[in-house]
UniProtKB/Swiss-Prot annotation:
Superkingdom to which the source organism belongs: Bacteria
Record-level GO BP terms: prosthetic group biosynthetic process
InterPro entries, per database record: CitG, TriPribosyl-deP-CoA_syn_CitG
Reaction(s) catalysed (UniProt annotation): 3'-dephospho-CoA + ATP = 2'-(5''-triphospho-alpha-D-ribosyl)-3'-dephospho-CoA + adenine
EC number: 2.4.2.52
A Gene Ontology molecular function term of the record: ATP binding
Protein name: Probable 2-(5''-triphosphoribosyl)-3'-dephosphocoenzyme-A synthase 2
NCBIfam families: citrate_citG (TIGR03125), PRK10096.1 (NF007503)
Assigned protein family: Belongs to the CitG/MdcB family.
Keywords assigned by UniProt, alphabetized: ATP-binding, Nucleotide-binding, Transferase
Top-level class of the enzyme under EC nomenclature: transferase
Length: 298
Protein backbone atom coordinates (compact mmCIF):
# COMPACT_ATOMS: atom_id res chain seq x y z
CA UNK A 1 0.00 0.00 0.00
CA UNK A 2 1.38 3.37 -1.00
CA UNK A 3 2.44 5.45 2.05
CA UNK A 4 0.74 8.78 2.67
CA UNK A 5 3.19 11.63 3.23
CA UNK A 6 3.26 12.92 6.76
CA UNK A 7 4.24 16.49 7.53
CA UNK A 8 5.67 17.49 10.90
CA UNK A 9 4.16 20.96 11.07
CA UNK A 10 1.40 22.85 9.34
CA UNK A 11 3.89 25.57 8.42
CA UNK A 12 5.88 23.13 6.28
CA UNK A 13 2.94 21.86 4.25
CA UNK A 14 2.65 22.81 0.60
CA UNK A 15 -0.89 22.52 -0.80
CA UNK A 16 0.24 20.64 -3.92
CA UNK A 17 1.87 17.85 -1.91
CA UNK A 18 -1.33 17.52 0.09
CA UNK A 19 -3.43 17.51 -3.06
CA UNK A 20 -1.23 14.76 -4.49
CA UNK A 21 -1.60 12.75 -1.27
CA UNK A 22 -5.39 13.03 -1.33
CA UNK A 23 -5.40 12.17 -5.04
CA UNK A 24 -3.36 9.05 -4.31
CA UNK A 25 -5.96 8.06 -1.72
CA UNK A 26 -8.74 8.44 -4.27
CA UNK A 27 -6.74 6.43 -6.81
CA UNK A 28 -6.18 3.70 -4.23
CA UNK A 29 -9.90 3.74 -3.46
CA UNK A 30 -10.68 2.96 -7.11
CA UNK A 31 -8.10 0.16 -7.21
CA UNK A 32 -9.24 -1.26 -3.87
CA UNK A 33 -12.80 -1.53 -5.13
CA UNK A 34 -12.08 -3.17 -8.47
CA UNK A 35 -9.54 -5.61 -7.01
CA UNK A 36 -11.95 -6.65 -4.25
CA UNK A 37 -13.19 -10.18 -5.03
CA UNK A 38 -15.65 -11.78 -5.42
CA UNK A 39 -18.18 -9.01 -6.06
CA UNK A 40 -21.69 -9.90 -7.27
CA UNK A 41 -22.15 -8.86 -10.90
CA UNK A 42 -19.10 -6.57 -10.91
CA UNK A 43 -15.69 -6.70 -12.55
CA UNK A 44 -13.08 -8.07 -10.15
CA UNK A 45 -9.94 -10.23 -10.12
CA UNK A 46 -11.97 -13.38 -10.82
CA UNK A 47 -14.24 -12.43 -13.71
CA UNK A 48 -15.93 -9.58 -15.57
CA UNK A 49 -19.25 -9.94 -13.75
CA UNK A 50 -22.28 -9.05 -15.84
CA UNK A 51 -20.10 -7.05 -18.25
CA UNK A 52 -19.00 -8.16 -21.69
CA UNK A 53 -17.30 -4.90 -22.67
CA UNK A 54 -14.82 -4.35 -19.84
CA UNK A 55 -12.19 -6.19 -17.81
CA UNK A 56 -9.93 -5.63 -14.81
CA UNK A 57 -7.14 -4.07 -16.85
CA UNK A 58 -9.55 -1.43 -18.18
CA UNK A 59 -10.26 -0.30 -14.62
CA UNK A 60 -6.57 -0.14 -13.76
CA UNK A 61 -5.85 2.02 -16.82
CA UNK A 62 -8.88 4.17 -16.10
CA UNK A 63 -7.90 4.78 -12.47
CA UNK A 64 -4.40 5.80 -13.54
CA UNK A 65 -5.79 8.27 -16.08
CA UNK A 66 -8.24 9.77 -13.58
CA UNK A 67 -5.59 10.02 -10.89
CA UNK A 68 -3.79 12.86 -12.65
CA UNK A 69 -6.95 14.96 -12.84
CA UNK A 70 -7.94 14.76 -9.19
CA UNK A 71 -5.57 17.50 -7.92
CA UNK A 72 -7.14 19.83 -10.51
CA UNK A 73 -10.54 19.37 -8.87
CA UNK A 74 -8.94 20.34 -5.55
CA UNK A 75 -7.24 23.35 -7.10
CA UNK A 76 -10.53 24.51 -8.56
CA UNK A 77 -12.30 24.05 -5.22
CA UNK A 78 -9.60 26.14 -3.55
CA UNK A 79 -9.73 28.85 -6.22
CA UNK A 80 -13.44 29.62 -5.98
CA UNK A 81 -14.04 29.99 -2.25
CA UNK A 82 -15.64 33.40 -2.86
CA UNK A 83 -18.37 31.77 -4.91
CA UNK A 84 -21.48 30.52 -3.12
CA UNK A 85 -21.18 26.73 -2.96
CA UNK A 86 -24.15 26.11 -5.25
CA UNK A 87 -22.29 28.02 -8.00
CA UNK A 88 -19.22 25.76 -7.89
CA UNK A 89 -20.68 22.83 -9.84
CA UNK A 90 -20.88 24.75 -13.12
CA UNK A 91 -17.12 25.25 -13.07
CA UNK A 92 -16.49 21.63 -12.18
CA UNK A 93 -18.32 20.31 -15.24
CA UNK A 94 -15.59 21.16 -17.79
CA UNK A 95 -13.02 19.47 -15.54
CA UNK A 96 -15.26 16.43 -15.20
CA UNK A 97 -15.77 16.21 -18.95
CA UNK A 98 -12.03 16.48 -19.60
CA UNK A 99 -11.39 13.79 -16.99
CA UNK A 100 -14.00 11.57 -18.66
CA UNK A 101 -12.29 12.08 -22.00
CA UNK A 102 -9.00 10.94 -20.45
CA UNK A 103 -10.78 7.86 -19.07
CA UNK A 104 -12.25 7.00 -22.47
CA UNK A 105 -8.86 7.42 -24.15
CA UNK A 106 -7.29 5.07 -21.60
CA UNK A 107 -9.98 2.41 -22.04
CA UNK A 108 -10.61 2.73 -25.79
CA UNK A 109 -14.11 4.02 -25.18
CA UNK A 110 -15.20 1.88 -22.22
CA UNK A 111 -17.10 3.63 -19.40
CA UNK A 112 -15.35 2.26 -16.33
CA UNK A 113 -15.43 5.10 -13.80
CA UNK A 114 -17.87 7.80 -14.95
CA UNK A 115 -19.75 7.61 -11.63
CA UNK A 116 -16.53 7.85 -9.66
CA UNK A 117 -15.38 10.89 -11.63
CA UNK A 118 -18.59 12.57 -10.48
CA UNK A 119 -18.33 11.58 -6.81
CA UNK A 120 -14.56 11.88 -6.40
CA UNK A 121 -14.54 15.11 -8.39
CA UNK A 122 -17.08 16.60 -5.98
CA UNK A 123 -15.21 15.37 -2.91
CA UNK A 124 -11.84 16.56 -4.22
CA UNK A 125 -13.29 20.01 -4.95
CA UNK A 126 -14.69 19.97 -1.42
CA UNK A 127 -11.22 19.17 -0.08
CA UNK A 128 -9.76 22.16 -1.90
CA UNK A 129 -12.48 24.50 -0.66
CA UNK A 130 -12.26 23.37 2.96
CA UNK A 131 -8.46 23.42 2.96
CA UNK A 132 -8.39 26.95 1.54
CA UNK A 133 -10.94 28.10 4.11
CA UNK A 134 -8.95 26.36 6.88
CA UNK A 135 -11.95 24.30 7.90
CA UNK A 136 -11.84 20.69 9.15
CA UNK A 137 -11.56 18.04 6.46
CA UNK A 138 -13.56 15.04 7.63
CA UNK A 139 -15.95 12.59 6.03
CA UNK A 140 -18.86 14.61 7.34
CA UNK A 141 -17.62 18.04 6.24
CA UNK A 142 -16.66 16.75 2.79
CA UNK A 143 -20.07 15.19 2.18
CA UNK A 144 -21.87 18.27 3.47
CA UNK A 145 -19.81 20.50 1.18
CA UNK A 146 -20.49 18.22 -1.80
CA UNK A 147 -24.19 18.48 -0.98
CA UNK A 148 -23.92 22.27 -1.01
CA UNK A 149 -22.29 22.12 -4.45
CA UNK A 150 -25.20 19.99 -5.73
CA UNK A 151 -28.06 22.01 -4.26
CA UNK A 152 -31.00 21.83 -6.67
CA UNK A 153 -29.27 19.37 -9.00
CA UNK A 154 -31.97 16.69 -9.10
CA UNK A 155 -34.69 19.26 -9.74
CA UNK A 156 -32.72 20.85 -12.57
CA UNK A 157 -31.60 17.67 -14.29
CA UNK A 158 -34.08 14.90 -13.49
CA UNK A 159 -37.45 16.58 -13.18
CA UNK A 160 -37.40 18.49 -16.44
CA UNK A 161 -39.43 17.04 -19.30
CA UNK A 162 -37.31 16.69 -22.40
CA UNK A 163 -38.50 15.24 -25.68
CA UNK A 164 -35.65 12.75 -25.44
CA UNK A 165 -35.21 11.58 -21.86
CA UNK A 166 -31.79 10.62 -20.56
CA UNK A 167 -31.46 7.25 -18.83
CA UNK A 168 -31.41 9.03 -15.47
CA UNK A 169 -34.53 11.05 -16.25
CA UNK A 170 -36.37 7.94 -17.42
CA UNK A 171 -35.55 6.00 -14.24
CA UNK A 172 -36.54 8.98 -12.13
CA UNK A 173 -39.90 9.32 -13.86
CA UNK A 174 -40.62 5.59 -13.88
CA UNK A 175 -39.24 4.50 -10.50
CA UNK A 176 -38.44 7.69 -8.58
CA UNK A 177 -34.72 6.86 -8.48
CA UNK A 178 -32.40 9.85 -8.20
CA UNK A 179 -29.15 7.90 -8.55
CA UNK A 180 -25.75 9.49 -8.08
CA UNK A 181 -27.18 13.02 -8.30
CA UNK A 182 -29.66 12.46 -5.49
CA UNK A 183 -27.11 10.78 -3.24
CA UNK A 184 -24.65 13.63 -3.73
CA UNK A 185 -27.26 16.35 -3.21
CA UNK A 186 -28.34 14.66 0.03
CA UNK A 187 -24.74 14.56 1.31
CA UNK A 188 -24.12 10.85 0.70
CA UNK A 189 -26.42 9.54 3.45
CA UNK A 190 -25.94 5.91 2.42
CA UNK A 191 -22.23 6.35 3.09
CA UNK A 192 -22.30 8.64 6.13
CA UNK A 193 -25.18 6.97 7.98
CA UNK A 194 -24.73 3.36 6.92
CA UNK A 195 -21.69 2.15 4.97
CA UNK A 196 -18.95 4.15 6.69
CA UNK A 197 -20.06 3.41 10.29
CA UNK A 198 -20.56 -0.26 9.32
CA UNK A 199 -17.10 -0.54 7.77
CA UNK A 200 -15.42 1.22 10.68
CA UNK A 201 -17.22 -0.98 13.20
CA UNK A 202 -16.14 -4.17 11.43
CA UNK A 203 -12.52 -3.01 11.36
CA UNK A 204 -12.72 -2.11 15.05
CA UNK A 205 -13.93 -5.65 15.73
CA UNK A 206 -10.84 -7.03 14.00
CA UNK A 207 -12.56 -8.13 10.78
CA UNK A 208 -10.24 -8.74 7.84
CA UNK A 209 -10.28 -5.50 5.77
CA UNK A 210 -11.28 -7.23 2.51
CA UNK A 211 -14.06 -9.19 4.20
CA UNK A 212 -15.22 -5.98 5.90
CA UNK A 213 -15.39 -4.22 2.53
CA UNK A 214 -17.32 -7.09 0.96
CA UNK A 215 -19.79 -7.00 3.84
CA UNK A 216 -20.10 -3.23 3.42
CA UNK A 217 -20.77 -3.70 -0.29
CA UNK A 218 -23.64 -6.04 0.58
CA UNK A 219 -25.04 -3.40 2.92
CA UNK A 220 -24.92 -0.79 0.16
CA UNK A 221 -26.53 -3.18 -2.31
CA UNK A 222 -29.36 -3.89 0.12
CA UNK A 223 -30.14 -0.18 0.60
CA UNK A 224 -29.20 1.57 -2.63
CA UNK A 225 -31.74 2.37 -5.33
CA UNK A 226 -29.04 1.54 -7.85
CA UNK A 227 -29.85 2.98 -11.26
CA UNK A 228 -27.26 0.68 -12.87
CA UNK A 229 -29.26 -2.31 -11.67
CA UNK A 230 -32.62 -0.76 -12.53
CA UNK A 231 -31.49 0.14 -16.05
CA UNK A 232 -30.65 -3.52 -16.68
CA UNK A 233 -33.33 -5.32 -14.68
CA UNK A 234 -36.07 -2.81 -13.99
CA UNK A 235 -37.85 -2.54 -10.65
CA UNK A 236 -38.03 -6.33 -10.31
CA UNK A 237 -34.31 -6.77 -10.85
CA UNK A 238 -33.48 -4.04 -8.34
CA UNK A 239 -35.86 -5.51 -5.76
CA UNK A 240 -34.39 -8.98 -6.22
CA UNK A 241 -30.81 -7.76 -5.80
CA UNK A 242 -31.64 -5.71 -2.70
CA UNK A 243 -33.44 -8.67 -1.14
CA UNK A 244 -30.63 -11.13 -1.89
CA UNK A 245 -28.06 -8.81 -0.32
CA UNK A 246 -30.30 -8.27 2.72
CA UNK A 247 -30.74 -12.03 3.18
CA UNK A 248 -26.98 -12.60 3.17
CA UNK A 249 -26.51 -9.85 5.75
CA UNK A 250 -29.30 -11.29 7.90
CA UNK A 251 -27.55 -14.67 7.81
CA UNK A 252 -24.41 -13.09 9.24
CA UNK A 253 -22.74 -11.46 6.28
CA UNK A 254 -19.14 -12.05 5.21
CA UNK A 255 -17.34 -12.93 8.43
CA UNK A 256 -14.79 -15.53 7.35
CA UNK A 257 -13.28 -16.76 4.06
CA UNK A 258 -15.76 -19.66 4.20
CA UNK A 259 -18.57 -17.13 3.65
CA UNK A 260 -17.17 -16.21 0.24
CA UNK A 261 -19.00 -19.21 -1.24
CA UNK A 262 -22.24 -17.25 -0.82
CA UNK A 263 -20.80 -14.31 -2.74
CA UNK A 264 -19.63 -16.60 -5.55
CA UNK A 265 -23.18 -17.94 -5.82
CA UNK A 266 -24.64 -14.42 -5.72
CA UNK A 267 -22.17 -13.39 -8.42
CA UNK A 268 -23.30 -16.19 -10.73
CA UNK A 269 -26.94 -15.28 -10.16
CA UNK A 270 -26.23 -11.63 -11.03
CA UNK A 271 -24.36 -12.68 -14.17
CA UNK A 272 -27.27 -14.89 -15.24
CA UNK A 273 -29.69 -11.99 -14.66
CA UNK A 274 -27.32 -9.46 -16.28
CA UNK A 275 -27.33 -7.27 -13.15
CA UNK A 276 -24.38 -5.13 -12.10
CA UNK A 277 -24.58 -2.90 -8.98
CA UNK A 278 -22.23 -0.26 -10.33
CA UNK A 279 -23.82 2.51 -8.28
CA UNK A 280 -23.10 0.62 -5.07
CA UNK A 281 -19.53 0.01 -6.25
CA UNK A 282 -19.12 3.77 -6.70
CA UNK A 283 -20.40 4.34 -3.16
CA UNK A 284 -17.97 1.71 -1.85
CA UNK A 285 -15.15 3.73 -3.42
CA UNK A 286 -16.45 6.82 -1.60
CA UNK A 287 -16.71 4.83 1.64
CA UNK A 288 -13.13 3.58 1.50
CA UNK A 289 -11.80 7.00 0.50
CA UNK A 290 -13.55 8.73 3.40
CA UNK A 291 -12.46 6.02 5.83
CA UNK A 292 -8.82 6.77 4.96
CA UNK A 293 -9.05 10.57 4.73
CA UNK A 294 -7.46 11.15 8.14
CA UNK A 295 -4.23 9.50 6.91
CA UNK A 296 -3.27 12.77 5.24
CA UNK A 297 -1.84 15.06 7.91
CA UNK A 298 -2.74 18.65 7.16
Amino acid sequence: MMPIPANPTNASIQPQSLYDAWADLAWRAMLTEVNLSPKPGLVDRLNCGAHKDMALADFHRSAEAIRHWLPRFMEYGASCTRLPPESVLAGLRPLGMACEAAMFRATAGVNTHKGSIFSLGLLCAAIGRLYQLRQPITAETLCATAADFCRGLTTRELRQNNLQLTAGQRLYQQLGLTGARGEAEAGYPLVIRHALPHYRALLAQGRDPELALLDTLLLLMSLNGDTNVASRGGADGLRWLQQQAAVLLHQGGIRTPDDLVYLHRFDQQCIERNLSPGGSADLLIVTWFLAQISQVNH
